[in-house]
Amino acid sequence: GGFRGGEYPGIAAAMELGRSLDPQEIHGSLIMLHPVNIQGFWARREFIVPEDGKNLNRVFPGNPDGTLSEKTAGLISSSFFPLADFYVDLHSSDIHESLHPYVYYPGQPTEELAAKARSVAKVLNVEYMVRSMATGGAYNYAASTGLPSLLIERGGAGLCLHEDIEEYKSDLKNIMRKLGLLNEPVKPRRYIPRDVTDIIYLEAQETGCWLHHIHSGDFVEEGQVLGRPTDLFGETLTTYYAKQSGI
């Protein structure tokens, strides 16, 4: 957890889980890295590693002779991923963002790997699991090497709420049960994730102040207003609408 220093719930969950687990009860090996971007964590910086201004999660597989971000990614790619049978990346919305809890699983490079990741995603207490065909980021790079991976998104907006930490720890322990690291059955959860495969990404075409008309997790109808950017005097520059009905 902690590729981005301002995404706190996953960092806190890894800290607490590491202290609470009994090594005698773990079958196999569990490796936890947190917070990976410790410079950004102490500086309370969103997205980037302060020393080089790069998004650590976007420079994989990294470069041992590059900047700090690239060296960190290179070390994880060369020394950590080869040891793992399954990789879980803990995220949340960054300091200036909000989100509804969900999980990404890689849709490539093979259907067998996607099915393995999807089967583990199903034990999480989130409403949605999203099949990603992207190639960027640590978990997608891990998948490209044949390592089944997940990226969980839970909590955020610069907060580190107790309920998000507890939900994260429950998710992680259920993953450990599913993978056989804990010799006990998967615990019941409130949600069974629905598989989402049709994703639309909107990018702003203007520079301005974003005023949203909806909230994370809302269901929207096709044509519904999502939000509008304004200039610094409050003049609406354009309006963005939902291209189809969905979450």
Residue ranges with predicted function:
Residues 1-247:
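Structured catalytic-domain cores with a bias toward divalent-metal coordination
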